[in-house]
Each structure stands twice: as C-alpha cells, then as structure tokens.
Amino acid sequence: MIQGKLARLGNVISADKCVDYLLNRPKLEMVGLGLIYGHPGLGKTTYAQRIAYSRGYIYLRLEAWMTAKTFAVALKKAVLQHLGMGNNPVIGSAASIYNSLIGLLAEHPEVVIVIDEIDYAFKEQKILSAIRDIVDETLAVVILVGMQNAKDRLYQINRYYFDRCGVFCEFQSPSKKDIAILAATVMEVKFGADIVDYIYKRNQGTLRDTIKLIHSLESVAKVKNLGQISVHDLEG
C-alpha cells in the first residue's frame, strides 16, 4: 500500500473550501474562526495534521489535563517557534501570556492555528474564552477540530461563541466514490467495482476501517501474487 498520500476525498475537499473561505473572508467584518467536526475514524486529525504541515500552519492538540495556563504556554511556544523567535521558556501569569500572545498575533495576521481535540476545552471554558479573544482581537485564523457533538456543545455552552464561528464542516462517512478514489490512490494492485462494494459494506462507515480493509486486500493479493484483485479471490 502506498504511504503518505492524501486522497482528495469529499471530506478533504469540503474542509479545504472552509479553510480557504476563512482565509479570504472580509477580515474587518468577520472573525477567522471555524469548526471541523464528526464521528471518530473519519480522518479529522489526519486532515488537520497534514493541512498544517503542507500549508505551514500551527498544529496544537489539546490534552485532557490542560488548563487555561498550560494551554497559553503551549500555544505561545508554538507561535514563537512558528515565527522563528526561538524556544525560550514561557513565563508569567495566564493573563500576561495571553496578552503577549495577542500582541504577537496582531503583528502577524497571516498566522493560522489548528487546534485539535477541542472537546477537552468544553470542561475548561477559559480556554474557549481565550480562543475567542484571539480571533476577536487579531486577524489570525483558528480552526477547531472536534467530535460529532462539538457543534451542539458550542451552541449549548455559549450562543455568542457559536455565532462567532464563520464556517462549520462536518466530516461524513466515506461514500463509494470516496472509497474508489482512496483505493486508486493507495493500492498497488488493480481492482474493480466489486472490491469497492466489498469495502463499502464492511467498513463500519469509517475511513479507519476502510484503510484496514484495503491493507488486508493487498495482503491477499501479495500472498496470491495477483496483479488485480476481485471478490472471487477472497473466497476459500
């Protein structure tokens, strides 16, 4: 199986459009805040990491133990490294760190920050407030990535915060077209529509299981020395 390729699946295309919309928004009228959300196993984290790497964005993953202070420290470190300003210790109160961070981002409006596992912030709402202040007081773009109920949780916690989000992108289960595109991108053996149907019926609606099935199909093809695989090759 070919490694390291990001297939242009429906979720990737939709998420790219949402990110580009935020980048090209009327900046003085709309804050740069968006949310990518969806069920586990649909490729949200893979997308977040790869778009950050490929476009030169900052990627930060929230941890369950993070407080407003530790988040401030982690984010400021990431911003300083991104801007080539060294790796010095970040000290001071949470308020002073956030103030200096907002000052940095105000001077560098091109910065884009991807924050994964935003669900952990729902129990530490000071983190959510800090993110809101960043997008309210600077032109930076912040893309939140969370689970399937993240959109509803934001609405329940703070309607004003919910309204600040300029775009919402829900990751969906892979379609047959997505499976065909992914298989064509990563499989090293040929296949037909029967294999696409086979995967679609067994992937539990997730990209993660789709990839596992593709790997198992390639293993069968390798053992049987096949250049093309069909459902009939899986029998017996």
What are these regions (language model features)?
Residues 81-108:
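Central P-loop NTPase core of STAND/AAA+ ATPases
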Residues 4, 101-124:
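Conserved P-loop NTPase "ATPase switch" module shared by AAA+ and STAND
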Residues 1-17, 31-32, 41-47, 84-88, ...:
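C-terminal alpha-helical "lid" subdomain
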